[in-house]
Amino acid sequence: MIEKLISASLRNRFMVLLIAVILFGFGIFAIQNNKIDAIPDLSENQVIVFTEWQGRSPQIIEDQITYPLVTGLQGIPKVKYVRANSMFGMSFIYVIFKDHVDPYWARSRVLEKLSTVKNDLPNGVSPTLGPDGTGVGHILWYTLETNGMDLGEQRAIQDWYVKFALQNVDGVSEVASFGGFQKQYQITVDPNKLSYFKVGITDVMQAVKSNNNEAGGRKFELSDRGYIIKTSGYLKNIQEIENLPIKTNNSIPVKISDVAQVQMAGENRLGIFDYNGTGEAVGGIVVMRYGENAADVIDHVKAKMKEVAKGLPEGVKFNIVYDRSGLIKESVNSIKHTLIEEMLVVSLIVMIFLLHWRSAISIIIQIPITIAASFIILNAFDISSNIMSLTGIALAIGVIVDNGIIMSENSYKQLSIRQAELNHQKKESE
C-alpha cells in the first residue's frame, strides 16, 4: 500500500504539490479562525440547577428540595453522576454528563425533567438552570468606581443598567453581580402594638400584598372615542406603605404606621466584597458561553463597556480588576515566538548538516505545511489555541524534521546504491 502510494506520488508530482498548496491554504484559514485562550477547558460537562427557598435551614433544604431533585434528575440519559450541596436558603445540584454529550442537549434534558420533578417541591419554589458556561468561563471582572456613592445606588446601577447591557454582548452567558446590597422596603413590626390592635403578622403581609397591585379594565367608548380603563396601585414610596389600612377598629382604620416602622434599607447579606482593602465595592463577573472564543468575547465586552460608560452617572466609571485577555496574549504570543524560533533554528541546522539544498528544502517545507494542517485538525475537534496545544505543536517539530531526514537519507542511500550498480554495469559492458 505504501509502495503504491509513493509510486503514485512520484508519477503525479504536480498533483502532490497542488494538494500541499491547498492544504497549506486551508491551514492558514484555520489559523485565522481558530479560537484563542490561555488554558484549555478541562472542566466537566455539567448543568447546574439552583433553587432558592429563603429562611429555611440546610436540613429542610436537603429534605424538601435537594433530595427530590437529585432522585428525579438521576434518570436522565448519559449522566455520569449527580452532586448536590444544601445550605441556608439555597440548594445547588450539579448534573455531570459524559464528555461527548452536547451541552445544550444536556440542558434541554434537565429542563424537561425539572418540569415534572418540581411538582414534588413546596409551593412557590421553582428551580432554575445555571448559566451555559464552563468552569473556566469567568473571563472578566469589573467594579464601579464612584465618588462616595451609596452602595445601594451602585448596586441599582449595576443590576438595572450595566448588567442588562453587557448580557446582550454576543458570547456572554451571564453577568453575575456582586457587592453592595439590593434596596428594599423593610417593615419592622412592633409585637406590643400588634397585640394592642389585635392584628397578626399575616394581616400586615396581606394588606401590603393586596394593595401593591394594578388591574386592567375593559375598553369603553365615549363621544366617538375609545378609552382603556386601568387601576394604578403599585406602591411608590414609604408614605404610601405607611398609610395602607390593615383593618378597622371601631370604625377607625388601623394603618401600617400604627403597628410597624417602614424604612428603605438593604437586604440582609451573607458576605461583602472588599477591593484590595480599600473598602466595599460593587461590580460584576462576565461569564462566557460554551464554545466561544475568549479573546473575541473580551474585546466585544470592552467595546460595549465604552458605550455603557457614556450613560453612567457623573463620577461613575468602570474599573477592570481581572482581564484574561492579557494572560491570553502573553501566553499565546510567547509560544508563537518560541515556535518561530524553533522553525528557524531547525531549518538552519538541517541546511548545515545535510549540505544538500534540495534535500534540505524538501524537509524544511514540511514544517509550515504540517503546522498549518494541524490547525485544521484543531478546528475540527473544536480545540482552541492555548499553552498546551501550541506547546504540543512546538514539540512535534523535531518529529516532523526527523521523519523527513530519515526519508531523505534513505532515498539518497538507495539512489547511491542504484547509481553504483549502473556504473558497474556500464564498466562491464565496455
List PLM regions with ranges.
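Membrane-proximal extracytoplasmic
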Residues: 1-343, 352, 358, 423-424
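Hydrophobic transmembrane alpha-helices and their membrane-interface caps
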Residues: 27-32, 37, 317, 344-412
